[in-house]
Amino acid sequence: MIVRAWRGRAAPAQPDDYPEHFRFRVLPALKEIKGFLGASLLRHDRPDEIEFLVLTRWTSLDAIRAFAGEHLDRAVVEPEAMEALVSFDPTVRHYEVIEEAAIRRRK
């Protein structure tokens, strides 16, 4: 499994714009791509900005290529996302998952 990581930053006055874009535009599009396994949107509040970290999970680099095109390390940032953010990383990082664990709670 491959994790694709990207960061964007929003103004504190607009804390919900990017999460709404992610939830209603990005996720539905990603779910249509073969090889997409899931995504997480993480938020870190700072005094002067809100940092979002997007982690998407994929079966392979070929699956990512179906989303990102041939330039795998270039961020895919739609105009709506650009409007919701004050800055963002122009590139992404890919990580190979070498171990994963989850806690299963008893009911």
List PLM regions with ranges.
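Glycine-rich beta-strand-turn "strand-cap" elements at beta-sheet edges
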Residues: S40-I50, V76-K107
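Intrinsically disordered, low-complexity segments enriched in polar/charged residues with Gly/Pro
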Residues: Q14-D16, L27-P28, L42-D45
